[in-house]
Swiss-Prot record:
GO terms for cellular component: cytoplasm. It comes from the Archaea. The lineage of its organism: Archaea, Methanobacteriati, Thermoplasmatota, Thermoplasmata, Thermoplasmatales. This is Shikimate kinase. It comes from Thermoplasma acidophilum (strain ATCC 25905 / DSM 1728 / JCM 9062 / NBRC 15155 / AMRC-C165). GO terms for biological process: amino acid biosynthetic process; aromatic amino acid family biosynthetic process; chorismate biosynthetic process. Pfam families: GHMP_kinases_C, GHMP_kinases_N. Its EC number is 2.7.1.71. The gene is aroK.
Length: 268
């Protein structure tokens, strides 16, 4: 049976774009795989119908999702999901479409469907290319991207889930977030991610206990991933990350990911 399969990854916030539209994220090795097959239009899910209409695809689809990304915790599951689904549908249909076109389609559909307030080009970019991406989400431009050392990462997703579709921020945080942007564009990606998490943690709340446990176990960097509530820690070695997980009692030990999106098409 003919089908297409796409694998991408979740990520961690470097700069959350809710304040001024500037965004950034880096990829972690927590995969999501989406498989699409031809389906019946009467049973098609709305998200695949929206993508199909946007890309002018006639075929109706059914699909399955196999994901290790905790959803609703600030680890980029929505962007990975919509990008992988759109890419799989394009691959299945044999559409010649550029990376930027598929990311633009995914961003527009994310905003229209309420999955994202900004379109999250930064999150889509890290899911497309791996490594890190810095973007202008309002102008839909990738400003910088590159590889990172594949250091061990512990992510702990706990607490109430938080939607990215509707985010309300009261107060004047522009100056603070621009200092984060300065760090990121100077190449201090992890410092920026920490500072960004602290800013958004001050707005939405964060689990300082988890951050403290990671730092106590030897994390080089630890903070909240954007608006959270997931907490991340970056470690010099896997043993330290495993020890932190043991002390905390839960979490995913993984690593920074530099592998971009992968896809396969089967006609058997």
């Amino acid at each position: 049976m003919k089908y297409a399969r796409v694998r991408t990854h979740g990520g961690v916030s470097i700069i959350s774009a809710f304040i001024d539209g500037m965004g950034g994220a880096f990829s972690i090795d927590v995969p999501m795989t989406v498989t699409v097959r031809e389906g019946t239009c009467s049973e098609e899910k709305k998200i695949s119908e929206d993508i199909r209409r946007y890309l002018s695809i006639a075929t109706c689809f059914r699909f399955t999702v196999d994901s290790r990304i905790p959803s609703g915790y600030g680890l980029k599951s929505s962007s990975a999901y919509i990008l992988a689904l759109a890419k799989a549908m394009a691959v299945y249909s044999g559409i010649d479409i550029s990376d930027m076109e598929i990311m633009t389609a995914s961003a527009d559909i994310s905003k229209n469907s309420g999955l994202s307030m900004t379109g999250a080009l930064d999150d889509l970019c890290q899911a497309m290319y791996g490594g890190y991406c810095l973007t202008d989400n309002r102008k839909m431009k990738i400003l910088r991207r590159g590889r990172l050392p594949e250091m061990p990462v512990l992510v702990c997703a706990d607490g109430d889930k938080r939607s990215s579709g509707k985010v309300s921020i009261e107060g004047h945080f522009t100056n603070a977030i621009r200092r984060v942007e300065d760090l990121a564009f100077k190449g201090r990606i992890f410092d920026a991610a920490v500072a960004n998490g602290l800013i958004y943690g001050s707005i939405f709340g964060m689990d300082l206990r988890l951050i403290g446990s990671m730092l106590k176990a030897g994390a080089l960097y630890s903070s909240q991933s954007g608006k959270g509530p997931a907490i991340f820690g970056i470690f010099a070695d896997r043993r330290s990350a495993m020890n932190a997980r043991s002390d905390i009692g839960f979490g995913i030990v993984t690593k920074i990911n530099n592998q971009g999106i992968r896809y396969w098409k089967y006609d058997s």
